[in-house]
Amino acid sequence: MNIYIGNLNYRVRESDLQQILEEYGVVYSVKIIVYRDTKRSKGFAFAEMPNAAEAQKAIEELNQAEYEGRQMVVKEAIPRR
């Protein structure tokens, strides 16, 4: 299952998110989206977890949780059209 993680502090790294999500199960990948020209974080990321039940538990427990001074938005990612 692909997960959207938003409202992230700009200092958060992919390894930080990977560590948090691994508390709920296996994580295939984490990708923080950055501005092409400055390489600065846009404040959101996508993660892929193969087990839907583990991903759903992570979504339920992490959505609205505070991390690095900001309240995260965590939900199932909507595929591009």
Per-region residue spans from a language model:
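Intrinsically disordered, low-complexity RNA-binding regions enriched in Gly/Arg/Ser/Tyr
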Residues: M1-K42, E48-R81
